[in-house]
Regions:
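Conserved beta-strand scaffold positions in the cores of enzyme catalytic domains, especially
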Residues: 58, 86, 153-155, 195-198
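Mid-domain catalytic core of redox enzymes
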Residues: 66-189
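Aromatic-acidic/polar surface patches that form glycan- and anion
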Residues: 36-43, 126-127, 206-213
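Conserved beta-strand termini and adjacent loop/short-helix elements that scaffold enzyme active sites
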Residues: 59-63, 140, 199
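Active-site catalytic microenvironments for nucleophilic, acid-base chemistry
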Residues: 53, 94, 223, 227
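C-terminal catalytic lobe of FAD-dependent flavoproteins
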Residues: 169-231
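Active-site/ligand-binding neighborhood in enzyme catalytic cores
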Residues: 1-85
Length: 231
């Protein structure tokens, strides 16, 4: 916990520490959900198929602020007033140029290593809680179910404080009252924009697991469609 968050456990929000289960059980899985799995071909092909539609245009490597701007509670898209829905999933402080200060996050560095042997640690994920600089090692073949592989590949995760530098990714919001107060300032700026929805870890400054995030996204889509039906 101290390595991951850079704080003492007593200084960390119970919302965070409460995510780590302590179980007396013969079930040694981290999650206790009845159904668990990963996409057969991986997440990338799954998302590629989801986005492969004539009504969807994907642009990567584009800063949304190059296409969107906000003036007097009006959204402009490519310089033209836009009255449709915008679902924003990025960092909310960065959308508003961090004008109140940067929201604190923890980031991660991933170091991949390959070994010419059948197994490295014998399990998919092992947490390292003592003197190592990394917090956990993932050995992928135990997640994918691959057999007869040419060696084994692992990744070590090294946590550090997010600074906004190029190449860094904000993974985990640091849930403290002062940080929540700062987030609320940014949320107030977004609150006056019509049909502008905040969704996800960054936009909401919350921690979500993928199943909860998927459910939240589907609920938002249903709510938007229901609202459009009323208009």
């Amino acid at each position: 916990t101290m390595k991951q968050w850079g704080q003492k456990p007593e200084d960390i929000s119970p919302e965070v520490t409460g995510r780590v289960p302590v179980l007396v059980s013969y079930d040694n899985r981290y999650f206790q959900d009845k159904y668990q799995g990963v996409p057969k071909e991986g997440f990338t092909p799954m998302f590629e198929r989801m986005l492969d539609h004539e009504n969807i245009t994907v642009e990567t490597g584009v800063d949304c602020k190059e296409r969107l701007r906000f003036e007097e509670n009006q959204i402009y898209f490519d310089g033209t007033p836009f009255d449709g829905e915008v679902i924003y999933t990025g960092a909310l402080d960065e959308l508003f140029d961090c004008q109140f200060g940067r929201l604190p996050y923890r980031s991660l560095r991933f170091d991949f290593e390959h070994y010419e042997k059948e197994s490295y640690q014998g399990h998919s994920v092992v947490n390292y809680t003592v003197s190592e600089d990394f917090t956990r090692i993932t050995e992928f073949k135990y997640l994918t179910g691959q057999k007869n592989t040419d060696g084994t590949t692992i990744v070590k995760e090294y946590p550090f404080a997010y600074t906004g530098a190029e190449g860094e990714i904000p993974y985990y919001a640091i849930l403290e009252p002062k940080n929540q107060e700062l987030y609320e300032k940014y949320r107030a700026l977004a609150g006056g924009l019509p049909h502008f929805y905040l969704l996800g870890r960054l936009a909401e400054y919350k921690y979500y697991n993928i199943d909860a995030m998927t459910k939240k996204a589907m609920e938002l889509a249903d709510a938007i469609m229901a609202e459009n039906t009323k208009r």
